[in-house]
Amino acid sequence: MDYYETGKYVFVHGWIPCTQWEEGINMFGEKISNYDPLPDWRTGNWDKASWLNGMDCWNKNIRIKDKIILCGHYHSSWGHCFIHKQGIDIPKTYDDINENWHTEPFVDDGIICLDACTVLSGKVNCWKIDKQKKININKENKDD
């Protein structure tokens, strides 16, 4: 299954299919991607879409009108750092894991990114969808 769609939500791993093209290289030597929407995202290339940074795509206007996309794959701290300008992206050392590293869900208009970078944070983000209200649960497993 490539995605699951309800009336209000679309659940994906990375993001919805779109056309990705390289725009250049940033100061860290990383590729800068840009994206163009597809006429019908449902029939696009899901092999590629599964590995996209959904927050980057969302920030570059790859969205679904009147839907909220729940994604993972890429750590939510990226969105907090580079889009919301809060905290750090990824800690360079274990000593950098502190309150400045935001691993809670990245939430904005049309997106909920749940990836907590569990391997480093020890946290798993969950999002309960209720017809009456939304409840965010961020549970840290301190025993394992």
Please give the residue ranges for each predicted region.
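Acidic, His/Gly-enriched loop-helix segments that form or flank divalent-metal centers
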Residues: M1-C113, C117-G122
